[in-house]
Amino acid sequence: MDLSRIFKAYDVRGVVPDELNPTIARRIGAAFAVWADAPEIALGRDARLSSPDLAAALREGITSRDVDVVDLGFASTDLLYFASGSLDLPAVMITASHNPKDYNGLKFCLAGAKPVGEDSGLADIEALAEKGDEIIGEGHGAVRPRDLLDAYVEHVLRFTDVEHMRPLTVAVDTANGMGGLVVPPVMARLPVTLHHLYAELDGTFPNHPADPIDPENQRDLKAAVLRHGADVGMAFDGDADRVFLVDERAQDVSGSVLTALVAAAMLEREPGAKIVHNLICSWAVPEVIREHGGIPIRTRVGHSFIKQVMAETGAIFGGEHSGHYYFRDNFNADSGLIAAVIALGELSRSNRPLSELLRPYRRYAASGEINTHVDDPQATIERVAEAFRDGRPDRLDGLTVEFDDWWFNVRPSNTEPLLRLNVEARTEELLEAETQEVLAVIEGEGAPS
């Protein structure tokens, strides 16, 4: 039984039922119970049409090993992390996040919301599950429903000053995903007029894919911001762990800009603290951290690296350009909703439009991530390194090369034969020129002039 197609670097993900189905989920549940070696495991699920059957199979697999299940029912991924942290239990989330409706998947964590990835247990779980039905036990663990939504809402609200927040108008698009479960009860506790698009939980995602990183999927949100004169717009992905903002003019707020805003807010509360950012964040992020008296720590791309470095260094916050935001006081786990609530608090306190509040952080022009299919990613990276040898290189993750006025990072995908390129420059003109120059080398068509 070969499960390598669905076991990825950080989770399990595949097309239902061809790649992931109740039979496989049952075995994976039993395998996780054996590997985690805990008396109880928390289980949550998103609203995909296949999630109830996969949840039933996971419960069967887990309880067959005489392990009890704390069944959260519907959950966002960050609600599941809260359950794992507050109850001190290993946990499984059934979700395929922003993937199309035909997909589903599983995210795992250990007690205290500690990450489980390819190098921290996922490969062991895969090996156990590949034993097939022999991993299924004959035990009879109990299943206990548990509703943690109210406790989770209280937890999220601790990250901002609710009492002194001024009235705001907020547009939210949860894309029929799990944000429809967690966003309304949080916003109901704030002085917010909420315009909520696609709030209903619907695993067919009838309005648009639950993937806000694609600009096409933010069109309705941006129209709502302008139509209602909203102070801010928020787009959540399918399992509601990532958030993307737009300002009152319906202009994008990049993950780096929101990281800088949240970092500044956190450093006001804890001066001198350490803050983690990944290496494709804007130059603005470490600059803002230093300007506010903090210590920036640069990491590889990927949530397991951020969480590991936060745990090792005691950092209070970590941000990724991809829309993930991690908090020490949230068990080092990520929560788009906590980041959104902190942003609302800062917007309220500033008494300015969001575009003005963010102007000091919008310092550079960025390309966004550009993917290029290549036959040999590593050989291509070496060709790029040679072509741009006049810059300042580092190899923390792929290849980063810095110049005085611009920088780029190129790194291979974990799962496909492609390279991911990010470029940033001091001006739009320089960005355009240098992006084309790097792409020409990647595509084997040129070298820098």
Give short role names for the model-derived ranges.
Residues 91-103, 225-247, 252, 295-335:
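Glycine-rich phosphate-binding loop
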Residues 104-228:
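Gly/Ser/Thr-enriched, mixed-charge loops and adjacent short helices
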Residues 268-449:
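Phosphate-binding and adjacent anionic-ligand microenvironments
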